């Protein structure tokens, strides 16, 4: 089949998204609804599922009104990893739509969607090292080709995005707090508080952030009355520490693989300080750094539709449609 046109559905966590993407990289329709879980101080799975049930039909209806779905090649949906209830909603609605249109439906690995999102806007070649950093995942992957990935390392506890949100909660900010931490860090002194950069003296590409979380709790409770200056300095110190960990593990990954290209993917990859730190690392090591802009960093359906197009073109369509909350490479 040529000139693929795919409708993608993304419901792995707390974003409800639908997109229609062409093989040429044109995003014909794209809508993302971000749920409000602030009163829970984190993603509440049951609420997420109910919101997907309510919102997804509305977005699909708008997609139908905006585009002739008879022209679609197929439907694609995230099958994992993610929250099981949220995944079930997306998979069942994608299957129902595909049945009504008499179109095939394909499952997509959410992490592969993040990894390939950059190729929707920039035709970079394989192989490359991909650092996926989001609220639920932190991994280093040797990407050798479509469907050919090797996990080099991952977090042993908290994901980077999760750590940002937990710090925000400790400081009294609403969930999600990653952007608040980033904004405050701009005004802070990154050298005021020394935080443990766990595992940077160990070989391999695994991360650990639990020690940083414990250290942050001690710092915050030791301050008699925390000021805005204290908060800014804590955020800046934390951000500098996690960026240092990323650089260290990325350097080890590049040495293992020997690739000259790096891809930064996932929502935390939109953090300006982290991007600038990794850009400096890449420049100093004669490497090229690539990342998608804007909403393509976050959970979105355009990356799911694009991953399906890439897999169709490569002849890799074997992924099961069963929701797989712990799906890995």
From Swiss-Prot:
Reactions it catalyzes: L-threonylcarbamoyladenylate + adenosine(37) in tRNA = N(6)-L-threonylcarbamoyladenosine(37) in tRNA + AMP + H(+)
Location of the protein in the cell: Cytoplasm
Pfam families linked: TsaD
The keyword Plastid belongs to this UniProt entry's keyword annotation: no
Keywords: Acyltransferase, Cytoplasm, Iron, Metal-binding, Transferase, tRNA processing
Function, as annotated: Required for the formation of a threonylcarbamoyl group on adenosine at position 37 (t(6)A37) in tRNAs that read codons beginning with adenine. Is involved in the transfer of the threonylcarbamoyl moiety of threonylcarbamoyl-AMP (TC-AMP) to the N6 group of A37, together with TsaE and TsaB. TsaD likely plays a direct catalytic role in this reaction.
The record's free-text note on cofactor binding: Binds 1 Fe(2+) ion per subunit.
GO cellular component: a single term: cytoplasm
Biological processes per GO annotation: tRNA threonylcarbamoyladenosine modification
EC number per UniProt: 2.3.1.234
Protein name: tRNA N6-adenosine threonylcarbamoyltransferase
Domain of life: Bacteria
GO molecular function: iron ion binding; N(6)-L-threonylcarbamoyladenine synthase activity
Species the sequence originates in: Neorickettsia sennetsu (strain ATCC VR-367 / Miyayama) (Ehrlichia sennetsu)
Cofactor(s) in the UniProt record: Fe(2+)
Binding site for Fe cation: 110, 114, 299
Family assignment from sequence similarity: Belongs to the KAE1 / TsaD family.
Binding site for substrate: 132-136, 165, 178, 271
